Amino acid sequence: MHLKIVLAFLALSLITIFALAYVLLTSPGGSSQPPHCPSVSHRAQPWPHPGQSQLFADLSREELTAVMRFLTQRLGPGLVDAAQAQPSDNCIFSVELQLPPKAAALAHLDRGSPPPAREALAIVLFGGQPQPNVSELVVGPLPHPSYMRDVTVERHGGPLPYHRRPVLRAEFTQMWRHLKEVELPKAPIFLSSTFNYNGSTLAAVHATPRGLRSGDRATWMALYHNISGVGLFLHPVGLELLLDHRALDPAHWTVQQVFYLGHYYADLGQLEREFKSGRLEVVRVPLPPPNGASSLRSRNSPGPLPPLQFSPQGSQYSVQGNLVVSSLWSFTFGHGVFSGLRIFDVRFQGERIAYEVSVQECVSIYGADSPKTMLTRYLDSSFGLGRNSRGLVRGVDCPYQATMVDIHILVGKGAVQLLPGAVCVFEEAQGLPLRRHHNYLQNHFYGGLASSALVVRSVSSVGNYDYIWDFVLYPNGALEGRVHATGYINTAFLKGGEEGLLFGNRVGERVLGTVHTHAFHFKLDLDVAGLKNWVVAEDVVFKPVAAPWNPEHWLQRPQLTRQVLGKEDLTAFSLGSPLPRYLYLASNQTNAWGHQRGYRIQIHSPLGIHIPLESDMERALSWGRYQLVVTQRKEEESQSSSIYHQNDIWTPTVTFADFINNETLLGEDLVAWVTASFLHIPHAEDIPNTVTLGNRVGFLLRPYNFFDEDPSIFSPGSVYFEKGQDAGLCSINPVACLPDLAACVPDLPPFSYHGF
């Protein structure tokens, strides 16, 4: 009996041990289930930032609502919601942050003065007046507005004619309705026989500008096959119509001309009559298949996922509203409704490097033998680089663990809109050493630092193109601005013959990928060790010198040249002209070695091409003449372009070339303006989409004697070990810690998407 008790006790003990082992092994702390990685690094010590200033933060939902309520009360009951407004109505088109004057902002940030009043800029379309116009109103102070002032003349030198207004949704809708209900019924047999049109299988793509002279509002509209899930931009049918929609009453709109296969007609009725009589040359265009070449559906079944980047010790940055802080950098980002991504008060180790770095404009100019394409000059700020940024996809548009930030906007409708995930912030591991050296002469050692950067990103989907905007901040104090282009190409119908190939490559059965240029303009308001800066150009020349130890032999010795560019005209480097290989903004402070502290500007852009100066559209695009210009900073020269240029490109409200008037640049607050551009000749590999690879341009700001040494040497991730040391020890080499530190599960948020 005693033996049975002992055996039973042993059996019970074994069961208990197995049960405990199972619990330990399967619990979150057990070896089979590693712990979750921290979301924020406990070692990250954000650099102190002077308060949580709201100077540059985009307007909140509450502020936008307060401005709308105030304007509705002040402007009276005649206002119509912009989403339904007809051309003859009054409506509030947009509301966004009015940036404060720089002097007042710096007084608050640097000297503790009260913050300047927080204000909004509203654009109001007055179509219901005897003399319709566009007005710009500043409203403040927020969040409880009590005043508004008209700044139209102050900002633009005079009133804004009504024909310059952006096209509202209701006008776009009415334009297509006019074609569908008034014009297309004039050619039912031609349309159904030639394009298989059934009332819903065609859509229009517009040319801009809308006319040929100031005051016009007439748009060439090219028809494309429109099938769900298929990129309509790749399916032109060859039919284009010129719609005059200048009249405020859509009942008075008319089609002035029709273009088909190289010929112009009075209207679709004439086209129908010639088709019925058999005199019309036609090319029948079948409907595209749903899963054809223009579809972005994968041609393969799902396979292994791409590599996942994660931070085993947690993020090295934090996002608080619009403020981003890390152990090295701090800045505030903004998201202009029209101009898009911008950053302010950019500081490295607490010292301001830049007051503002921002996108100004994005233009593409097309060529082909159809009227819609040959006229097209898209100025994308007018469509809204910011308003068209939304729905970034985790794991594709941004790393999966990126911080996704929602943006509130008010444009084109009377209610506040949420742009979910319009901006993302993340750390970028670049798979490259920022610096390294393996020494084997005299002694043996290795030192290096893996390159990583802090990135803020938005993506503007403007019509067919998608522009990926990044501002990238590095541990050595460098700041990069870059843009990648992707999306669908714009196409024209290819009639046949070699003449069509003067404007691009054939990319489909009857499809021409049309040649075009891209140009992007950036504003760099740098404050290099203060507000007083100089522009310095350095280069090298070879000079002959007799070898001192043997004068019979001559050497060609490189020698530095240095020039202070003291006037604006000296810094206006035309597109295509050579830039000094080193050009930097210098301060009146010196580093430990007696050199002026500076920041160098490098432009990453192939040799561009600008529209000829004799073009009557050129002055509105005059910023594109220059790859680089440095000017005195002025509040009245805050932007290089205007949203009103798209619909009146012949009478610009802002002419950037006029900023350059040979003023002194010696010890002044300076702004550098950078143009980055490239040529795109579409080809077969642009189908279905243009890839980002090879379609990237931008600029780089690099410290030049700003520090006494490379500040990245203080990075905690630096690696150094010598011969004889055990590089596998964590105490010697921080990279050796990774197998233990990375033994955690990334804390991944569930995937969600709200971009539609």
UniProtKB/Swiss-Prot annotation:
Signal peptide: none
Its EC number(s): 1.4.3.21
Catalysed reaction equations from the record: 2-phenylethylamine + O2 + H2O = 2-phenylacetaldehyde + H2O2 + NH4(+); tryptamine + O2 + H2O = indole-3-acetaldehyde + H2O2 + NH4(+); tyramine + O2 + H2O = (4-hydroxyphenyl)acetaldehyde + H2O2 + NH4(+)
Named cofactor requirement(s): Cu(2+); Ca(2+); L-topaquinone
InterPro entries attached to this UniProt entry: Cu_Am_Ox_Cu-bd, Cu_Am_ox_TPQ-bd, Cu_amine_oxidase, Cu_amine_oxidase_C, Cu_amine_oxidase_C_sf, Cu_amine_oxidase_N-reg, Cu_amine_oxidase_N2, Cu_amine_oxidase_N3
Binding site for Ca(2+) 1: 525-527, 669-670
Residues found modified as 2',4',5'-topaquinone: 465
PTM characteristics: Topaquinone (TPQ) is generated by copper-dependent autoxidation of a specific tyrosyl residue.
PROSITE patterns recorded: COPPER_AMINE_OXID_1, COPPER_AMINE_OXID_2
Extracellular topology ranges: 26-756
A Gene Ontology term for the protein's cellular component: cytoplasm
Record's cofactor remark: Binds 1 copper ion per subunit.
Transmembrane regions: 5-25
Tissue: Expressed in many tissues including adipocytes with higher expression in retina where it is active.
Positions of Ca(2+) 2 binding: 568, 637, 659, 661, 663
Disulphide-bridged cysteine pairs: 398-424, 730-737
Pfam families in the record: Cu_amine_oxid, Cu_amine_oxidN2, Cu_amine_oxidN3
Keywords tagged on the record: Calcium, Catecholamine metabolism, Cell membrane, Copper, Cytoplasm, Disulfide bond, Glycoprotein, Membrane, Metal-binding, Oxidoreductase, Signal-anchor, TPQ, Transmembrane, Transmembrane helix
Family: Belongs to the copper/topaquinone oxidase family.
Function: Catalyzes the oxidative deamination of primary amines to the corresponding aldehydes with the concomitant production of hydrogen peroxide and ammonia. Has a preference for 2-phenylethylamine, tryptamine and tyramine. Could also act on methylamine and benzylamine but much less efficiently.
PANTHER family: COPPER AMINE OXIDASE, RETINA-SPECIFIC COPPER AMINE OXIDASE
Protein name as it appears in the record: Amine oxidase [copper-containing] 2
Lineage: Eukaryota, Metazoa, Chordata, Craniata, Vertebrata
Gene name as annotated: AOC2
